[in-house]
C-alpha cells in the first residue's frame, strides 16, 4: 500500500451536505470469502471500493477465481462485482496477501470445504491488540478438520466432508461465527452454533448463503442451525450499508456544528449509534432516502461508552466518539471490552491539545475549548478516522501520516468531505 498523508485545514466551516452511504466492508469481505463455496457466477451490488476489498479480490484470484469490478464513478460507492470460482486450483494463500488484511482468515472454512485442505498464512490488518484465531481453529476442529499451526501458517485438511456438530462458543466472536457458518453449510448433517455473533453483517452473510441454497435457521439470534447441502449456486445480492461509515460522517457533522444527509441508511441501521449521537447533542432524523444528522445543542455533551458485541456499542466506533468528546463540555469515559490496546490514538489526540488519559481499558477525556492542528500519525483504520474528525474541528492545519490506513474502510473520504465544505487534501 502506497504511503499517504492527509492535510486537514480546520476551519469554522461546518461539515454540511449529502453523502451516499457505502456497502459495509464488514459484510462485503466475508461474503466475498463465501463465494469460494459457490458454483457459477455471483453478482454482488453495493460493494465498496476499498483496499481490503482489493486484497480479498487478489486472494480469490490467486486461488483461481475470476473477478470483474464495475465501478459506480458517479457516487464513488456501491459498485458491482462479479465473482466466479468454478475453476479453483490452489488452496494456499501466501503471507504477501494475508499480511495486508485480517479478513483473509475468513477463507479458511470455504477453502477447506471446497478443496479438502487449506493453507493460510496468519493474517495482518490493523494492529489493535491480540486477536487470535483460536476460536476459528477450534470450530473447524469440531467439524472434523485436522488443523495445525506451522510457523506463520494455519494448515487445515479433512479426509472427506466435514461433519455437522454442536459448536458452543465460550465468548462471542464475529469472525469465528462466520468461519464456522461457512464451513458448516456443506457439511454432512446438522450443525448448531450457540453463542453466535448477531451483528447485522453476520446476518447479511447468512442471508446471502440462503440465497445460494444453504439451509440456515435462527438468523439474527444467538443460535444458528445449519443443515448441510450438497452444493451452492451463485445468487445476486446487495451488501447492506455501512453503519460504521455513516456514524463517522455523522460525528464529523456534530464535531463541526454541521448537518449531513446520509443517503441509504436509517436510524434502525445505526442501532445504538443513533442514541449515542443524540446523547452527544446531535439530532438524528429519518428522511425518505436516508437520514439527516445535525448538531442539535449549542455544545457537545460528554458520553460514557462501553464497547460490547452487537447490539452493544461497536468497538469500531469508539475512536471517532473519543475525537468528538475532546470538545465536549465535561468529562467522557470510554471503556473498551472487545479488544485490548485500542487506545493508541490517544497520544496523537494529545498532540492536538486533547486532555485524554488512558488507564487499562478505559480512556478518560476531559473536554477542552479548542484543539489545534499538529502533525500526527494514524496507528490504524478507525484511529485515522478519529484524527480526521479532530482535524476538521481543530484550529490550524493537521497533517495525518500513515493515512493510507483510512482507505481500508472509507472510500474517497477526502473527496466526500470536500463536497461538504471540508478543506482536506490527500498527499501521496
From Swiss-Prot:
It catalyses: phosphoenolpyruvate + UDP-N-acetyl-alpha-D-glucosamine = UDP-N-acetyl-3-O-(1-carboxyvinyl)-alpha-D-glucosamine + phosphate. Its EC number is 2.5.1.7. SUPFAM superfamilies: EPT/RTPC-like. It comes from the Bacteria. One of its GO terms (biological process) is regulation of cell shape. It is found in: Cytoplasm. Keywords: Cell cycle, Cell division, Cell shape, Cell wall biogenesis/degradation, Cytoplasm, Peptidoglycan synthesis, Pyruvate, Transferase. Pathway: Cell wall biogenesis; peptidoglycan biosynthesis. UDP-N-acetyl-alpha-D-glucosamine binds at residues 102, 316, 338. GO terms for cellular component: cytoplasm. The active site is at residue 126. The modification 2-(S-cysteinyl)pyruvic acid O-phosphothioketal is found at residue 126. GO terms for molecular function: UDP-N-acetylglucosamine 1-carboxyvinyltransferase activity. Pfam families: EPSP_synthase. This is UDP-N-acetylglucosamine 1-carboxyvinyltransferase. It comes from Anaplasma marginale (strain St. Maries).
Amino acid at each position: 500500500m502506497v504511503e499517504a498523508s492527509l492535510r486537514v485545514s480546520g476551519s469554522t466551516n461546518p461539515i454540511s451536505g449529502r453523502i451516499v452511504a457505502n456497502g459495509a466492508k464488514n459484510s462485503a469481505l466475508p461474503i466475498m470469502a463465501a463465494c469460494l463455496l459457490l458454483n457459477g457466477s455471483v453478482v454482488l451490488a453495493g460493494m465498496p471500493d476499498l483496499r481490503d476489498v482489493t486484497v480479498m479480490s487478489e486472494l480469490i484470484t490467486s486461488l483461481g477465481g475470476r473477478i470483474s469490478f464495475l465501478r459506480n464513478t458517479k457516487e464513488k460507492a456501491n459498485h458491482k462485482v462479479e465473482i466466479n470460482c468454478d475453476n479453483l486450483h490452489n488452496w494456499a494463500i501466501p503471507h504477501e496477501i494475508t499480511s495486508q488484511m485480517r479478513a483473509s482468515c475468513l477463507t479458511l472454512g470455504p477453502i477447506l470445504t471446497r478443496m479438502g485442505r487449506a493453507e493460510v498464512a496468519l493474517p495482518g490488518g490493523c494492529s489493535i491488540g491480540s486477536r487470535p484465531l483460536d476460536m476459528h481453529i477450534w470450530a473447524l476442529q469440531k467439524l472434523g478438520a485436522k488443523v495445525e499451526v506451522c510457523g506463520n501458517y494455519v494448515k487445515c485438511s479433512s479426509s472427506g466432508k466435514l461433519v455437522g456438530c454442536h459448536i458452543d462458543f465460550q465468548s462471542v466472536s464475529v469472525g469465528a461465527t462466520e468461519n464456522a457458518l461457512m464451513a458448516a453449510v456443506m457439511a454432512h448433517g446438522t450443525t448448531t452454533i450457540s453463542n453466535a455473533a448477531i451483528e447485522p453483517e453476520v446476518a447479511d452473510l447468512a442471508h446471502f448463503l440462503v440465497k445460494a441454497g444453504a439451509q440456515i435457521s435462527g438468523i439474527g439470534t444467538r443460535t444458528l442451525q445449519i443443515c448441510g447441502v450438497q452444493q451452492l449456486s451463485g445468487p445476486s445480492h446487495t451488501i447492506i450499508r455501512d453503519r460504521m461509515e455513516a456514524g463517522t460522517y455523522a460525528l464529523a457533522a456534530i464535531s463541526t456544528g454541521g448537518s449531513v444527509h446520509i443517503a441509504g441508511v436509517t436510524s434502525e441501521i445505526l442501532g445504538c449509534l443513533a442514541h449515542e449521537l443524540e446523547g452527544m447533542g446531535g439530532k438524528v432524523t429519518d428522511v425518505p432516502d436516508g437520514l439527516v444528522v445535525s448538531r442539535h445543542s449549542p455544545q457537545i455533551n460528554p458520553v460514557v461508552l462501553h464497547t460490547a458485541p452487537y447490539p452493544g456499542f461497536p468497538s469500531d466506533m469508539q475512536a471517532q466518539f473519543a475525537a468528538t468528546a475532546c470538545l465536549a463540555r465535561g468529562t467522557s469515559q470510554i471503556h473498551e471490552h472487545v479488544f485490548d490496546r485500542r487506545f493508541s490514538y490517544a497520544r496523537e489526540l494529545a498532540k492536538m491539545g486533547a486532555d485524554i488519559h488512558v488507564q487499562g481499558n478505559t480512556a478518560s477525556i476531559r473536554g477542552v475549548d479548542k484543539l489545534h492542528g499538529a502533525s500526527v500519525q494514524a496507528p490504524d483504520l478507525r484511529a485515522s478516522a478519529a484524527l480526521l474528525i479532530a482535524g476538521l474541528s481543530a484550529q490550524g492545519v493537521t497533517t495525518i501520516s500513515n493515512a493510507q490506513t483510512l482507505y481500508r474502510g472509507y472510500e474517497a473520504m477526502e473527496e466526500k468531505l470536500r463536497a461538504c465544505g471540508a478543506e482536506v487534501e490527500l498527499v501521496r
